């Protein structure tokens, strides 16, 4: 995602939660390099807390090491650290494993009283049964973010946890399988506070855009409908992650549209039936089903952003070409292409590592556009190049304009697609320059067939 992408929320949800959990007597300064914030290594801090995803882990360690050189107390936590505690421990005075809601105030009290432990594990504290409401006033005061109009998103969440166990997803192993839902009254208050501190109208009909960061809002249809009814009262637009199968229900689609949903991000994974079966989705999904749902939602006023995965052990270059044509034919809203990546904490990572299939553990390459697993059928750089070239192909000016024409919510479609195009073009140019690649190298490439 481009650092300046409109689709990027205003702040990292983990930072928002920790800020909201922090007792008022503590002063907080939020610094986020995603927004080019400058780090003050000489700041008078009693503690420096750093959170990161896998792709940012190396940079997180660099920052931690620099602060520790200057005698600062460093605490590391977040997704990557929780599943690589031994690795992280070499760069921190303390590591936090799992959700921090139930341990953060204890940790801060220990810092204040010079008794900080080397490790705090969420499992050693009472279960996190309720969701922490976001304190947008405090987040605004602590951060360097300014107010935005309706073309940039403000993060919020309604639920946490997911009972499913998809092999490539880290959620059930981090936030857990217990599905927790916010108190509707608290949610409504947060939305009003977020509007007050982070939104500026741009025109008479301008509404704030909220990015719902829930892992899977649609697990419980009753709770989903209740949440949508509440969001309808708030006079906002929003986007959300949902299973494509929930969108077969016309009532759910109507409630989404009426509540102000501008698009749903759905993991479609593939249009190839054998690939869907490999992901345990072949019994419920198909390319034909996707096309129908996308068209029905479009007619109802809802965009579907499709997320697709490519696996060199399963997908051929011809499969990738067919997917590109499918995306074009169906005018899929802001499609996302990713190479299958076994992130630490997932079942897939454990299985691939045990089988010796992971070839790269340079975390900076875990951006879903590098091939980090063994590939017997394709030369890794060629496979990466094919995916990246195909990604760029669905973001030509022609395709962007056609999608804008065919899909609802035209402004967000156009503005965000242009940001995607800019970012992808820069990535492709850098890839070709760094690896001395050109399109002719992809011509006539066939997979190596074993056996």
Curated annotation (Swiss-Prot):
Give any Pfam family that matches.
Radical_SAM
User: Would you say which domain of life the source belongs to?
Assistant: Bacteria
User: Lineage of the native species?
Assistant: Bacteria, Pseudomonadati, Chlorobiota, Chlorobiia, Chlorobiales
Q: Which PROSITE patterns match?
A: B12_BINDING (PS51332), MTTASE_RADICAL (PS01278), RADICAL_SAM (PS51918)
Subcellular location(s) per record: Cytoplasm
Name of the molecule in the record: Bacteriochlorophyllide d C-8(2)-methyltransferase
Q: Binding positions for [4Fe-4S] cluster?
A: 162, 166, 169
Pathway linked to the protein: Porphyrin-containing compound metabolism; bacteriochlorophyll biosynthesis (light-independent)
Gene3D superfamilies from the UniProt entry: Cobalamin-binding domain (3.40.50.280), tm_1862 like domain (3.80.30.20)
Question: Which Enzyme Commission number(s) are on file for it?
Answer: 2.1.1.332
Query: One biological-process term from Gene Ontology?
Result: methylation
Organism name: Chlorobaculum tepidum (strain ATCC 49652 / DSM 12025 / NBRC 103806 / TLS) (Chlorobium tepidum)
What InterPro entries does its record include? Bacteriochlorophyll_C8_MT (IPR034498), Cobalamin-bd (IPR006158), Elp3/MiaA/NifB-like_rSAM (IPR006638), Methylthiotransferase_CS (IPR020612), rSAM (IPR007197), rSAM_horseshoe (IPR023404), Tetrapyrrole_Bchl_Biosynth_MTs (IPR051198)
Keyword Iron-sulfur recorded: yes
Radical SAM core domain residues are 148-377
Record key words, sorted: 4Fe-4S, Bacteriochlorophyll biosynthesis, Chlorophyll biosynthesis, Cytoplasm, Iron, Iron-sulfur, Metal-binding, Methyltransferase, S-adenosyl-L-methionine, Transferase
Q: Which gene encodes it?
A: bchQ
- According to the UniProt record, what class of enzyme is this? transferase
């Amino acid at each position: 995602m481009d650092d300046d992408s409109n689709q990027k929320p205003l702040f990292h949800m983990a930072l928002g939660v920790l800020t909201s959990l922090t007792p008022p007597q503590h002063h907080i300064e939020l610094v986020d390099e995603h927004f080019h914030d400058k780090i003050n290594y000489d700041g008078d801090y009693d503690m420096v807390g750093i959170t990161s995803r896998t792709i940012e882990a190396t940079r997180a360690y660099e920052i931690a090491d620099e602060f520790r050189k200057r005698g600062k107390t460093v605490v590391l936590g977040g997704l990557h650290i929780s599943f690589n505690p031994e690795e992280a421990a070499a760069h921190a005075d303390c590591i936090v494993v799992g959700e921090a809601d139930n341990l953060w105030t204890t940790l801060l009290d220990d810092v204040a009283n010079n008794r900080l432990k080397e490790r705090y594990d969420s499992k050693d504290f009472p279960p996190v049964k309720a969701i922490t409401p976001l304190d947008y006033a405090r987040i605004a005061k602590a951060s360097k973010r300014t107010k935005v109009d309706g073309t940039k998103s403000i993060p919020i969440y309604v639920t946490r946890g997911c009972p499913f166990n998809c092999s490539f997803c880290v959620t059930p192993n981090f936030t857990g399988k217990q599905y927790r839902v916010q108190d509707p009254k608290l949610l409504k208050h947060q939305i009003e506070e977020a509007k007050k501190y982070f939104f500026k109208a741009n025109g008479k009909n301008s509404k704030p855009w909220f990015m719902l960061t829930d892992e899977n809002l649609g697990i419980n249809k009753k709770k989903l409908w209740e949440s949508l009814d509440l969001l309808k009262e708030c006079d906002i637009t929003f986007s959300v992650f949902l299973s494509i199968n929930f969108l077969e229900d016309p009532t759910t689609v109507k409630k989404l549209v009426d509540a102000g949903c501008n698009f749903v991000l759905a993991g479609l994974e593939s249009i190839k039936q054998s690939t869907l079966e490999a992901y345990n989705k072949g019994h419920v999904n198909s390319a034909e089903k996707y096309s129908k749902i996308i068209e029905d939602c479009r007619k109802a006023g809802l965009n579907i952003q499709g997320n697709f995965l490519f696996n060199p052990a399963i997908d051929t270059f011809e499969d990738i070409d067919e997917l590109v044509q499918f995306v074009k034919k169906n005018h899929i809203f802001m499609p996302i292409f990713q190479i299958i990546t076994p992130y630490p904490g997932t079942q897939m990572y454990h299985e691939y590592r045990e089988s010796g299939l992971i070839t790269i553990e340079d975390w900076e390459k875990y951006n879903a556009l590098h091939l980090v697993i063994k590939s017997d059928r394709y030369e890794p750089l060629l496979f990466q190049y094919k995916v990246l070239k195909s990604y760029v192909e669905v973001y030509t000016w022609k395709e962007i304009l056609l999608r804008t024409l065919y899909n609802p919510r035209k402004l967000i479609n156009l503005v965000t697609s242009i940001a995607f195009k800019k970012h992808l073009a820069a990535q492709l140019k850098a890839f070709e320059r760094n690896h001395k690649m050109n399109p002719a190298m992809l011509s006539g490439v066939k997979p190596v067939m074993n056996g």
